[in-house]
């Protein structure tokens, strides 16, 4: 119902995110693509990332960008979208069933197998208001303490910018020695 409401309100582009997990929903790749393409929505597959609170992520059970693309290619013709935003996390693909039938686009956020850290221009805010330069950052800034301490807007901007500038430009998720931050988003 939520998707229908957003669609009826005319909010576009409507993007639907899906995390495909081995032995859970691998069979949903093509039905999700069909649904989104039929309705003019942009589907974005996201590689499963080590974000859960119980540190249960297993790299060997992750469905990769290549596996998703291979499944999509069984039904669709995929052409890379070379006009996209270079800082966007998703790699976009133009999708068509055949040359006579217009398709749409599908994005894949492959933050594990094809990290985009070097071009990332994002910061994150945790549920309790801390600022991080990456989902996997171990350091945070606390703008609330600046506000509560009487700091100015410029002080907040300075702290936020400082956190963003310490971005290591590599989270190392796909490295053997990767350690998930103790505190999750």
Predicted regions and their residues:
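Radical SAM/AdoMet-radical enzyme domain recognition
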Residues: 1-46
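Intrinsically disordered, low-complexity sequence elements enriched in Ser/Thr/Gly/Pro
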Residues: 13, 42, 120-122, 130, ...
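Active-site/acyl-donor-binding loops of N-acyltransferases
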Residues: 49
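Accessory C-terminal segments flanking Radical SAM cores
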Residues: 52-172
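Intrinsic disorder and flexible/low-complexity segments
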Residues: 175-185
């Amino acid at each position: 119902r939520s998707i229908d409401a957003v669609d009826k309100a005319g909010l576009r582009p409507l993007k639907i995110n899906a995390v495909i997990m081995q032995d859970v929903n691998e069979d949903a790749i093509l039905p999700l693509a069909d649904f989104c393409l039929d309705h003019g929505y942009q589907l974005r597959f996201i590689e499963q990332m080590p974000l859960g609170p119980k540190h249960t992520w297993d790299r060997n059970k992750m469905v990769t960008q290549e596996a998703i693309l291979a499944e999509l290619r069984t039904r669709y013709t995929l052409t890379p979208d070379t006009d996209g935003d270079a800082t966007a996390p998703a790699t976009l693909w133009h999708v068509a069933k055949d040359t006579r039938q217009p398709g749409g686009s599908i994005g894949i956020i492959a933050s594990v197998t094809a990290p985009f850290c070097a071009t990332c221009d994002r910061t994150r805010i945790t549920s309790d208001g801390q600022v991080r330069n990456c989902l996997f950052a171990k350091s945070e800034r606390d703008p609330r303490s600046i506000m509560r301490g009487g700091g100015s807007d410029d002080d907040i901007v300075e702290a936020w910018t400082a956190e963003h500038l310490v971005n290591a430009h590599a989270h190392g998720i796909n490295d053997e020695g990767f350690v998930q931050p103790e505190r999750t988003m």
